[in-house]
Amino acid sequence: MDEARYLCNRSTEHENGIIIKPFIMKHFFTSALLCLSIAGAMNAQELANFNFGGRQKPVISPEIQNDSVTFRLKADYATVVKLSGSWMPNPWGGTIDMQRGENNVWEVKIPLPEPEIYTYNFVVDGVAVNDPQNVYVQRDGTRYLPMLIVPGERTENYGEATKHGTVSHPWYHSELLGMDRRLTVYTPYGYEANPKKKYPVLYLLHGAGGDEEAWTSMGRTAQILDNLIEKGLAEPMIVVMPNGNANQAAARTLGIPEKPMQMRWDRDAIAKMSEAERDLLMNGYVRSLCTEIVPFIEKNFRAIPKPASRAIAGLSMGGGHTISASVLYPELFDYICPLSAAGDATPEQLAALKKAGVKLYFLACGNTDFLFQRAEDMHAKLNELGFPHEYFVSDGGHVWSNWRLYLNTFAQKLFK
């Protein structure tokens, strides 16, 4: 698709204010058009074999070829260069040595991993370095990491669809948390063209270390929903992704000062609090979500204001928030999806939720996730109560590859 159109449609906030002087402009655009013409006419392999008249060939990285992928980095003065990738058995320490080649371009070819979205980086003389040839990156907290997208059935909904929804960043005022706070909101294709149509809403919550952009960056929410809706596999819906850090107004990349955090494990301080203060400390964000964000969305977007048209899902910390929201406000959401959840509920709370009526309770976790036992315990608790639910156990751990899979799965079950 047209990359310029993609950037305008997906993001309006990350723009570079670069001024190019007039006498440079002509040469800049001539060079740019030449590069685009060459790149547009050739694939990576053809470009690598192109005769550049004695000049150095451009460095292509990563380069997928049938059943392998090659990574390259030009590093003239390096002595040791390694590759680290999330497909490795130990991605937080495992590395592969790269070999120095012609013109000090370091290279390594590996078997093509299974279809999925991976992140990677180079380690140059002990220092982590991103791939300067790869413009496709994900932001995970404060880190930007290059992406490797391996095509296949698993990733077919992670790329761009033909018809695109819109991602915006409205702000709402929170009286409970004492600040204006930023949201990420996805509206489906056709939302602007059909001003009388109303939509159901999925409230999608991130985990610890994330923010309101985590699900669109690491989770590929816009791409997954675009594809599912275009294929008729999911109902057109609005997706609201709040910032789950109660002391933050927005993602740290915006540079907005944060409030000092009150530690939940400071027992002496908690003992001196009133009941209302303790509740605000423990449940302030969840109460803001249910009593401030939901009304804000239903006032400012064309959202259907009914429990049957509201869903809530979240990963890890956000899974805990999902469980808390569902038991504190049992009549608010008819679709509840805790994913790798760091949270729990009492049998009494779950019984009240069951009585209120739930159309779908979708519980998911990886079988090597450090929170897997919690998921097992919740599954057993729901069974003991005769609480109808779906329990999805996947391979793998506490990772985005699982959370993308869960979103791709449960989104097809909502609002039907």
Q: Which residues are covered by each model-predicted region?
A:
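Acidic, Ala/Val/Gly-enriched low-complexity intrinsically disordered segments
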Residues: 2-4, 13-15
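Positively charged n-region of N-terminal signal peptides that target proteins for export
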Residues: 21-28
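Bacterial N-terminal signal peptides
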Residues: 31-40
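Generic short amphipathic/hydrophobic targeting helices enriched at N-termini
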Residues: 14-16, 20-21, 34
